[in-house]
């Protein structure tokens, strides 16, 4: 979180913060269609890990006396705050570099490295940013394979073997997506629909 705040300060100071802020917060309600609402709902479900079994995983580790509504509100609030901070970091840097804001992997892996390369100490901030992205991806993937691990354990398979096996399958899918955009597109479509 501290690194996000440092990157936010850098973005405010060195990015085109006014354009980035306007891009994020000036709504064009003429573009609010049924499809746009469905895309927004899909994004919300994805970022909150709803429908993927992770709710079950995190719920199983909650103390019995925890307030579920309070936990839900805290997660939704913190997720929204982190997303807003990330947007306030990313888009001012994109606009300061004269790049077009995109979305998804194109923004993350194509546009942002160009933005970071044009910055003073961009290699340091870019490395820090992508380390944060890697940590977020790893922590999400751990919770995503837990339902499969629990199911395999019920069939009598050793937890360590189940974890390593599912982790290897996920890793192979990730490696395959590096070498073929068709694999990535198929995985993206399967997980988003």
Language-model features: where?
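Membrane-embedded translocation segments of transport machinery
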Residues: 2-138
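Juxtamembrane/interfacial segments flanking transmembrane helices
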Residues: 16-18, 144-147, 182-183
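Membrane-embedded alpha-helices of multi-pass transport/permease systems
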Residues: 52, 138-149
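Active-site proximal loops enriched in glycine and acidic residues that flank catalytic Cys/His/Asp
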Residues: 60, 132, 146-149, 166, ...
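Loop-to-transmembrane helix boundary motifs in multi-pass membrane proteins
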Residues: 78-84, 123-126, 135-138, 151-181
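A generic transmembrane alpha-helix motif of multi-pass inner-membrane proteins
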Residues: 180, 185-193
């Amino acid at each position: 979180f501290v690194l996000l705040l440092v990157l936010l300060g850098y973005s405010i100071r060195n990015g085109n913060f006014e354009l980035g802020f306007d891009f994020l917060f000036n709504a064009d309600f003429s573009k609010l269609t049924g499809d746009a609402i469905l895309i927004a709902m899909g994004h919300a479900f994805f970022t909150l890990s709803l429908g993927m079994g992770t709710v079950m995983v995190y719920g199983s580790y909650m103390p019995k006396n925890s307030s579920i509504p309070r936990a839900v509100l805290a997660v939704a609030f913190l997720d929204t705050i982190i997303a807003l901070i990330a947007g306030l970091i990313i888009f001012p840097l994109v606009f300061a570099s004269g790049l077009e804001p995109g979305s998804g992997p194109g923004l993350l892996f194509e546009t942002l490295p160009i933005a970071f390369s044009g910055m003073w100490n961009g290699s340091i901030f870019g490395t820090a940013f992508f380390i944060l992205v890697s940590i977020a991806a790893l922590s999400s993937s751990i919770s995503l394979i837990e339902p499969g691990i629990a199911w395999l354990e019920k069939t009598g398979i050793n937890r360590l073997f189940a974890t390593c096996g599912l982790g290897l399958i996920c890793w192979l899918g990730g490696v395959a997506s590096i070498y073929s955009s068709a694999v990535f597109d198929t995985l993206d479509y399967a997980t988003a629909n």
